[in-house]
Structure formats: structure tokens, C-alpha cells
Amino acid sequence: MADAADLRPAAANANFRSSRHAPQRFQTLHFRGTAMTQPTVVIKYGGHAMDKPELSEAFATDLAHLAGQGMRLVVVHGGGPQISALLTRLQIESRFVDGLRVTDEATMRAVEMVLCGQVNKAVVSAFARHGARAAGISGRDGGLLRARPKNPALGLVGEVTAVDPALPRCLLEAGFVPVVAPVASGPDGEALNINADTAAGALAGALAAEYFVLISDVPGVLNADGRLIPGLNRAEITRLKEDGVISGGMIPKVEACLNALDAGCSRALILDGRAQSSLRRYLLDDAPLGTVIVR
């Protein structure tokens, strides 16, 4: 398709900036109403920010406010706890390999039911209650996300190979907030389960978003002493992974940020979704929150 974005990594930028300068670099580009006209912001939404009622309501309020300020918002949501709950009721065992859910055909049916039905529509409804015009879609709609099986041991878990952003672009132009469930179409049209961080980063790159914000349950990337690192580049991320400081669930988050930057996104951030109005404070008030990822 003409609008499809190839996800093959671009050449790395050799001119790394020191992480201690990253927040200042990004603050000068923050949205100012007139300084940046209708910036596109792709948000990975999940964790406590989505599961805890008081945080989810606050997030919906902030999202509606940001949309009212002229930001073009795209939300990609997770739904792991809800999937596990349904599988338990169906007496299907939940198994994970390296943090990824092993997905056979029965599990995939449950995944698609929960993500595209239950969770997607609940998120859309929450946003609508607070005045945001949201439209729920999945990665299979309009050929948005295409993928191939990631690893035979994982079953129907996919890695994204291409993104066609035509559908979310149409929704954005019409004034809607696209809310995307991370399910993709495989080579034979089969449904594939996609890590939500990965899907969101791929979409941010394909849309050439000004911001990719990954909402997490931690303040950002932490150093070996448990203190927040305000900014990181690719070389520093590689070193911290080798040292075991970046591990587990943080690995796909930083990789999603780097992939988004490689594919055309301007800036990426891992942000604490447990902090009240963290997204709004970062985008509108230049609050020094989270970890900024640069190439």
C-alpha cells in the first residue's frame, strides 16, 4: 500500500547527545498552542493509569483537555490483566515466555475478544464521558498493522512488519481520537497478538508523530540505585542492558521508543502513569517528568 511504512531500522544517528542535556533539548520544543500547530501525540495507555478508576478518570479528563488544545492524539491500549481474567474463567492456562503471552488459537480468540471488544470500547466510552471524540479500531482494521509470527514457541504472537496509517490519519483529520487495540493481521490474514508497547511505537513512527509517550507504572528508566534517569540515548541504553540495569519489561519499552525514533517520530518519553496528570503536565507545562529517549 502506498502509505505503508516499512519498519526496517533506519541507520542510527551517530551524533549522540549526553542524557543530562536531553530534557532541556525537548523542553524547548514543547507544545505552546501557537509554537507548534496540532502536534501528533501517540500514547501507549496501560498499567495502573488504565486499571485504577481514579487514575483512568483523570487520564480521560486530561486527554479531552489536550484534544481541546489542538493536539492530534492516538491511543494504543493494553489489556493483559483483563485477558488473564477471561482465560481463567475459560479454564485456559496463561503462559509467558520472556514476558510475552504464549498464544494458541483459543487464547488468540480470547485476546481479540478482550482487546477489540471489552477494553477498546471501555476506553472509548471513558474518553467520550469527558468530552473527547474517540473512535475504537484494531490493528486489523484498514490494514493498519501487518505482522509475522515472532517465534514458533510463542504461537500467534507477532512482530510488526509494516504499518499503514491511512485509517488513523482519516480519523484525526475528522477530529477523532483513534483508540487502537494491538492486534495485527498475519501473512495469511490470521490475527496475531502484538505487544502494545511495540504496536504503539510502530504507529508513532509511521505517523511521524511529534511525541511518543509510553505510560508506565514506574517513574521512567531507573539507574542501579533506583533513581530516575532523565534522558538516555541508544549507546547508553545498550550499556545499561548489558549491565542488567535495564531488564525485564523495561526492555520492550526502550526498544519501542528507539524504533519509533528510527521510523520518523520526533521524540519519545517513558512516563509514570501513576502520577496525577503527568501527561498533561509534561506536554503543556514543561514538567521535568519521566525519561526522554533520544537516538
Predicted regions and their residues:
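Nucleotide/pyrophosphate-binding catalytic subdomain
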Residues: 3, 8, 13, 17-20, ...
